[in-house]
């Protein structure tokens, strides 16, 4: 981790030391950050809500000059996913090798399939599934669930096999 004075990690959040965090990043309660995840906030801050899962090699990069990237609660960023979106709501699943391009916005309860893209400046409405090689869209009928059991399991198992970052509690002023 570089520039730790601008990084705030809540006490109940698990961040493996192999993760890379640059710039102003605030990660709230209950998140799990796997090894080799990259948070790059060198161009603007990244604010992460509660109970998100960032799997191995996920890249979260704010490419907007000075504008914050906001990630809501209970999202899953799967292995090798990339996110440069300006906003990601809550309860979204970003699939393996999926890519949220610069400036796009993802609402709540969306599912982005493996290797799918949400293109620059595109705004997804709630409950949209993006799937297939042509990035087809459809509205889903059921909302995504909060990954409670997965979070509980990861919070127990990751500390047994990985070193974790020391954390600073997120204060109310932030």
Swiss-Prot record:
Keywords, alphabetical: Cytoplasm, Cytoskeleton
GO molecular function, one term: dynein complex binding
InterPro entries in the cross-refs: DCTN6, Trimer_LpxA-like_sf
GO cellular component: cytoplasm; dynactin complex
Signal peptide (residue range): none
Domain of life: Eukaryota
Function: Part of the dynactin complex that activates the molecular motor dynein for ultra-processive transport along microtubules.
Protein name: Dynactin subunit 6
Source organism of the structure: Caenorhabditis briggsae
Highest classification ranks of the organism: Eukaryota, Metazoa, Ecdysozoa, Nematoda, Chromadorea
Gene name of the record: dnc-6
